[in-house]
Design a protein with these regions (language model features):
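Beta-rich carbohydrate-recognition and catalytic domains
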Residues: 1-123, 129-156
Length: 156
C-alpha cells in the first residue's frame, strides 16, 4: 500500500520544532506523526535549526535528498537577529541544509551547501524540480539581493 510522506517543521519556540519531522497518510487528509512526533533529523550546523524543507528522489540513483532553510528562531531570533525579520533577511544563512538517504530511514550527516552569494541575504524556502527534457535538477529559492537594496525577495 502506498502512503504520502509529509516532511515538515513545527512552528515552536523550542529548538525541537525547527528540525525535520515526518508524518504519513494513506489519503492525504489524515496524518500520523512518525518517530513519536519527535524530530527525525536534527540540524547541528549553521543556525542549528531548519525550516521550509523539501524532499526529492533522484531518478538515476533512487536516493532521497532533503534540502532546508538554515534558520532557527528559537536559537537566534533574540540574540543573533535582534527580533528582526529584516535582520534575518539581510544577515541570515546563505547555505541550505542537506541530507541524503537510500531508504528514508537511514540518513547521511547534515551537510551545509552554499547557494547564495555575498550579494544575497538569507537563502529561504528551497524547492527542487526535475527537467525531464534535459535530465537535470533545478534547485530554486528566495532571497533578498543587494541590487535592490535588499528590498523585495526574488526567486533564484
Amino acid at each position: 500500500m502506498q502512503h504520502y510522506l509529509f516532511v515538515h517543521f513545527r512552528e515552536k519556540t523550542s529548538p525541537d520544532g525547527e528540525q525535520v519531522h515526518f508524518a504519513v497518510s494513506r489519503d492525504g487528509f489524515h496524518w500520523q506523526a512518525l518517530n513519536g512526533g519527535h524530530p527525525v533529523l536534527w540540524a547541528y550546523y549553521g543556525d542549528r535549526g531548519v525550516r521550509d524543507m523539501t524532499i526529492v528522489r533522484d531518478h538515476a540513483s533512487g536516493k532521497f535528498h532533503i534540502f532546508a532553510t538554515d534558520l532557527s528562531l528559537s536559537y537566534g531570533m533574540r540574540n543573533q537577529y535582534q527580533h528582526s525579520w529584516r535582520n534575518i533577511g539581510l544577515n541570515g544563512s546563505r547555505d541550505l541544509a542537506h541530507w541524503v538517504s537510500d531508504d528514508l530511514v537511514h540518513w547521511s550527516e547534515e551537510e551545509m551547501v552554499r547557494f547564495g552569494t555575498d550579494d544575497m541575504g538569507c537563502v529561504w524556502a528551497p524547492d527542487v524540480i526535475f527537467d525531464s527534457e534535459h535530465g537535470e535538477y533545478l534547485v530554486h529559492w528566495s532571497s533578498k539581493h543587494r541590487c535592490n537594496n535588499f528590498g523585495n525577495m526574488a526567486i533564484y
